[in-house]
Amino acid sequence: MGNKEKEENKKVMRKNILTSMFLATAMGVSAQTQQVTVVELHPAPGQFVNTLPEATAETTHEEVCEAATESLADEELIHLGTYGGYITVQFDHPVQNKKGSDFRILGNGFYAASDPVYGSETIGGSFEPGIVYVGVGDDVNTCKWYELAGSEYYTSEIHDFSITYHKPTAESGDHKQPFSTFDNYIKWEATWTAKDGTKRDSTGYHMKNSFHKQTYWPLWEEGETLTFKGGKLPNNAIDQSGKGSYWVLYRYAKDAYGYADASLNKDQYSTFDIDWAVDEQGNHVELTEINYIKVVTGIFQYCGWLGETSTEVAGFVDLHLVPGYDDDPIIIPVKQRPTGVASVRADGKDDVRYYDLTGRRVVNPTRGIYISNGKKIMIK
């Protein structure tokens, strides 16, 4: 089949999908399915932008959402780009909040075949966590959004990260970095508040690598800048080679939960509980059902020749439509909001993880205040 015929078939398929959705709405059809519709797709710049799904200079936002809807129906990847890029989907019905996890998000995370430090016990590989939000309301533009508080929410997540990317003025340029075709390709400017209350800011560039030659700027977006604001997760990549040739992207812990593309698709940790919803102050919110699901790339990290860390999604599953699921639902233990400062001695040897007040992991904590298991800990 030629490219022209393939494109015509795609157009027919898109028309059929939209026609079916319209007829179902007009006739009041109430059948619930696992079909999701992409209502927003706004990736940040990234090396697979405009290819997952494909887009050209003539592509509109509506058309790229239709293409993404088709991709998800086939469990094909949607690329969200670097930090802040997002996708919003809805099922043909509200997702109910029942006992245990309520939905699953498919990604492309996997464990490393060879971890030089942790070997077969590794929790590292290629994991690119995305923060998940749920929306309640009839219109995606006016609905109320709530973040699902994952395992890092009360400890190491930054909650007011803001970044602006500038549209590149050229697609090639000066380059000295390995595998780069343009070192100063995408300019960015970021601001945030550190855990100790210090206001921070930074400016830099993302390079364009030699493996992906198309523009990394989403072609359907208007304007010269893209700005994203929200939560930011701690970086998770380690250059295990020490030379930039072997990067391992780790899960935050074996029982880390609450993030898309941050575990294997078959794991319980790729499922999400609406009960994790919190408001902007981090307070628990009671929701009976949700209308929209948004996934946002949660890490701002660049890994040499691997490029930017980007969340990818490949599907969404309403677990309550899976036969027999509600009889034995997945229940994930969650970390509670810190309520005070506990006291421990510094000479204890255990597997507890400690973080300083900026969210950085501390391997050998000395005297001071740290965050551990969702609580502030004072080591004497």
Model feature map: region roles:
Residues 332-358:
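Residue-level detector of functionally pivotal "anchor" positions at catalytic/ligand-binding pockets or at interdomain
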Residues 1-33:
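Bacterial Sec-dependent N-terminal signal peptides
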Residues 32-128, 150-337:
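A domain-level signal for the mature, folded cores of soluble proteins
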Residues 141-148:
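Tryptophan-centered short beta-strand motifs
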